[in-house]
Amino acid sequence: MNHILAIDQGTTSSRAMVFDEALTLKSVAQEEFPQIYPRPGWVEHDPSDLWSSVAATARAAVERAEIDGSLAAIGITNQRETVVVWERASGHPIHNAIVWQDRRTADLCHALAEAGHEPTITERTGLLLDPYFSATKLKWLLDHVEGARARARRGELLFGTVDSYLIWKLTGGRAHVTDATNAARTMLFDIGRGIWDPEICGLLDIPMEMLPEVKDCAALFGMTRADLFGREIPILGVAGDQQAATCGQACFRPGMMKSTYGTGCFALLNTGEERVTSRARLLTTIAYQLGGKRTYALEGSIFIAGAVVQWLRDGLKIIREAGETQGLALSSDAAQDLVIVPAFTGLGAPWWKPESRGAVFGLTRNSGPAEFARAALESVGYQTRDLLEAMRADWAAGAEGVLRVDGGMAASDWSMQFLADIIGAPVDRPVVRETTALGVAWLAGMQAGLCPGPEEFAADWALERRFEPQMEASVREAKYDRWGRAVRAVMAV
């Protein structure tokens, strides 16, 4: 039997997983790497840490799977928007990678918005003018690394998101490529025409010579160096992490939606061939591109999901491990109706208020650890409903009635039941929780001829548990109204 290696390069760690051609998980390896915070609001990674952790985990996963030379394909999924610039000749980065969380270009984004450029940028790229995306990070590097822009114009420097940099390293510098989903997160890519946008590149003074070739999500991206795995292996699938999870959840029909719960939360709604422009400040993006055909999505991001549980553990110290929250929530006094708005780093979609800060409402003398745990978990459900309400308002065709979930917090039965209750719709949790790696393994396997196409893959998607709404509609709406008033109060401060 042939096997597929899925490389999952994330924000805090790199993971590698080996799947067989039936997409059964055979092995996992993971390695964390340091986060670099040069100044408040700045976040960087050393690209050598990204590469070394990927190389180490990839080799370890292959060894643990004991697959005896049957590795047939590689897929790559990655943290999106993070920027790497390196020398074409040597492969050496000219600066640390600037991570998607980095806010150093906030003033530049504000100036561009004040100059009236946001409507054009949003119309072309589907994105908001925000430091989150790659374009202004790349401009910052070209502005602040001596001689960088001139070298880029001479073809000496290359830009890439993390997938592109890893492909360059894996292939020994033979391929400078990316996929459409990663390109769509740079704020330089026209998602309607499927090309790098010359006008936006000109506005930011970014030489187009340094941009990678853009491919489908399932394509030949290059062959690895022979010394890495004993022979050259084709890289056949690439997608940004949230788009890979969308594929792993088999959200292939327009109207299907998934929500991934990690440190934050990312919800994607498949809108098919229709590119929907959001009126609620959601993002319009590419869900996946296969056979030259783009499928679009609306995306909403919540900054704080699983991170609110980390706050209970590391900040308030009312739990020792995340698993304790479910028991506390079950023992809480629901009548207290404590509300936590966890705007620790501002409010994400659909509010986009980076200056807002968190608050607790409804405190009484009897509010204790159990009530805080319950309110923290409930905040994730409320924020998810905010996203879904915005998606329904934006797209007349409407979302289907079921939300597919994955990520660490999806393991909590209590959280998923509350989510179903507060959105008033079923929540489906799959058997395979590693949907991001599964998605990119499927893309690579499909391109290799080992795995089925979308329809058959979707038919094989397996449900572990469905959570049906149990809360009375009047209670649901009263609770959600209270949440809305709390959010408005936070934004008013």
Curated annotation (Swiss-Prot):
Binding-site residues, ATP? 11-13, 263, 306, 310, 408
One GO molecular function term of this record is: ATP binding
InterPro entries in alphabetical order: ATPase_NBD (IPR043129), Carb_kinase_FGGY (IPR000577), Carb_kinase_FGGY_CS (IPR018483), FGGY_C (IPR018485), FGGY_N (IPR018484), Glycerol_kin (IPR005999)
GO CC field? cytosol
* Top-rank EC class of the record's enzyme: transferase
Q: Where does sn-glycerol 3-phosphate bind?
A: 11, 80-81, 132, 241
Xref: PROSITE patterns: FGGY_KINASES_1 (PS00933), FGGY_KINASES_2 (PS00445)
Transmembrane stretches, start-end: none
Which controlled-vocabulary keywords does the entry list?
Answer: ATP-binding, Glycerol metabolism, Kinase, Nucleotide-binding, Transferase
Q: What is its EC number?
A: 2.7.1.30
Which SUPFAM superfamilies does its entry note? Actin-like ATPase domain
Q: In which pathway does it act?
A: Polyol metabolism; glycerol degradation via glycerol kinase pathway; sn-glycerol 3-phosphate from glycerol: step 1/1
Q: Show the catalytic activity.
A: glycerol + ATP = sn-glycerol 3-phosphate + ADP + H(+)
Q: How is its activity regulated?
A: Inhibited by fructose 1,6-bisphosphate (FBP).
Provide one Gene Ontology biological process annotation.
Answer: glycerol-3-phosphate metabolic process
> A Pfam family in this protein?
FGGY_N
Task: Specify which residues bind glycerol according to the UniProt entry for this protein.
Answer: 80-81, 132, 241-242
Q: Which residues bind ADP?
A: 11, 15, 263, 306, 408
Q: According to its UniProt record, which protein family does this protein belong to?
A: Belongs to the FGGY kinase family.
As for what it does, the entry says:
Key enzyme in the regulation of glycerol uptake and metabolism. Catalyzes the phosphorylation of glycerol to yield sn-glycerol 3-phosphate.
Protein name as catalogued = Glycerol kinase
Q: Which gene encodes it?
A: glpK
